């Protein structure tokens, strides 16, 4: 995944991909979120926690923008680290379930394993919510999430229509058990 030349940086690690038509013909906007590696963390009792009290997280993409229908998703769990298909799938499904439990809403539908080559949609959505391991061509990027939706206009008309997520297996090693010097896919 490469930050497209047409992308406009809105904030650190947040890029507008512009407008495009979704598979139903609606005009939607794309956003790319890059999750950069941060320094090693130290718990407060060990002398850490001295950072700022502000956050750079986003609470909402846009007031009213949410999934209007259950969204199925697919994952191609193939990876160079040897993480099993079952582990990758069940971990993503469990993370989605935590998100749904926290919101008390069934947001995403069922997931499926897919062995086809998946492509993050940087120019326009293809109607498929995709997760896979690949190359994220941005220094220090652990993963990229691309979200397509309607983020402006009357809040009741706003919605999310697609998301794609890519974990960088070119620059980072991944682990299922929290091994030192590897990214913990469990978290």
Please tell me what each predicted stretch does.
Residues 1-85, 141-160:
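Disordered inhibitory propeptide/activation segment of secreted metzincin zinc metalloprotease zymogens
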Residues 88-187:
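Metzincin-family zinc-dependent endopeptidase catalytic domain
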């Amino acid at each position: 995944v490469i930050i497209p030349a047409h992308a406009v940086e809105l904030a650190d690690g947040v890029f507008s991909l512009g407008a495009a038509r979704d598979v139903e013909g609606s005009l939607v906007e794309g956003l790319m979120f890059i999750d950069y590696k941060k320094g090693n963390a130290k718990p407060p009792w060990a002398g850490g926690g001295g950072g700022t009290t502000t956050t750079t997280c986003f609470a909402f993409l846009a007031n009213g923008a949410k999934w209007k229908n259950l969204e199925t998703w697919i994952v191609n769990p193939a990876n160079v680290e040897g993480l099993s298909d079952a582990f990758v799938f069940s971990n993503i499904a469990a993370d989605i379930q935590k998100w749904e439990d926290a919101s008390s809403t069934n947001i995403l539908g069922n997931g499926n394993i897919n062995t086809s080559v998946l492509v993050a949609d940087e120019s326009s959505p293809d109607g498929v919510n995709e997760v896979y391991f690949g190359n994220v061509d941005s220094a220090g990027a652990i993963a990229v999430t691309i979200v397509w939706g309607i983020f402006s206009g009357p809040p009741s008309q706003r919605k999310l229509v697609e998301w794609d997520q890519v974990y960088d297996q070119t620059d980072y090693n991944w682990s299922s058990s929290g091994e030192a010097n590897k990214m913990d896919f469990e978290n």
